[in-house]
C-alpha cells in the first residue's frame, strides 16, 4: 500500500452518470488474479471501435492525447455501480488514476477502492458541475491538486473546494494503514482477549 498525502495530476472529464463496473472493465478480462495489466482494458468498449479492438475510438475522451497521462477522474453520480468486481479498481489504478471525484459512488466499489487506496472524493452535483465548467473554460490537460490532509482541491494553486471524508479512511490513507497493520495495532488486546477465554474455546 502507498501513503497518500497530496497528489497533483491531469484531470480527465468524464461527464457520464451511472458508469457500471462492466463498463470500467468488461467481464471477459476478469480471469487474471494478479493486479497488473488491467489498465489495458479500462473502459475497453469505449476506448476501442466496435469489432475493431485494436483501433482506438477517436471520439472517446481518454484517447485524447491531452489526457493520456490523466491521474484524476472527474465524473458523475453513482460511479462504480453494477456487479462487485475489485478488478474495476485495479484497472483504474493500473492505468494511473489516483483520485476519482464524483457526486456519489456505489457502496461496494467505495469499499474496494478504500481497500486498495484509491481516493474517492464525494462532492455535491453543484460543485461537480462547477468543476466541469472550470475544465471547459481552460486549455485541455488542466491539473488539480488534491490535498488529503487539508481536504481541499486546488485549481491553479487556488483553493477551489473543500471535501468531506470519513476520519478513519483519512487516517488510514495518510498513515499507510491497511487491514493487516490495523489488526496488528490491537495485537496485545487480541492476545489478552484470547487468553481470557474458557479452555474449550482456545
From Swiss-Prot:
It catalyses: (2R,3S)-3-isopropylmalate = (2S)-2-isopropylmalate. Keywords: Amino-acid biosynthesis, Branched-chain amino acid biosynthesis, Leucine biosynthesis, Lyase. Belongs to the LeuD family. LeuD type 1 subfamily. Its EC number is 4.2.1.33. InterPro entries: 3-IsopropMal_deHydase_ssu, Aconitase/3IPM_dehydase_swvl, AconitaseA/IPMdHydase_ssu_swvl, IPMI_Swivel, LeuD. Pathway: Amino-acid biosynthesis; L-leucine biosynthesis; L-leucine from 3-methyl-2-oxobutanoate: step 2/4. It comes from Blochmanniella pennsylvanica (strain BPEN). Catalyzes the isomerization between 2-isopropylmalate and 3-isopropylmalate, via the formation of 2-isopropylmaleate. It holds the Pfam family Aconitase_C. GO terms for biological process: L-leucine biosynthetic process. This is 3-isopropylmalate dehydratase small subunit. GO terms for cellular component: 3-isopropylmalate dehydratase complex. Disulfide bonds: none annotated. GO terms for molecular function: 3-isopropylmalate dehydratase activity. Heterodimer of LeuC and LeuD.
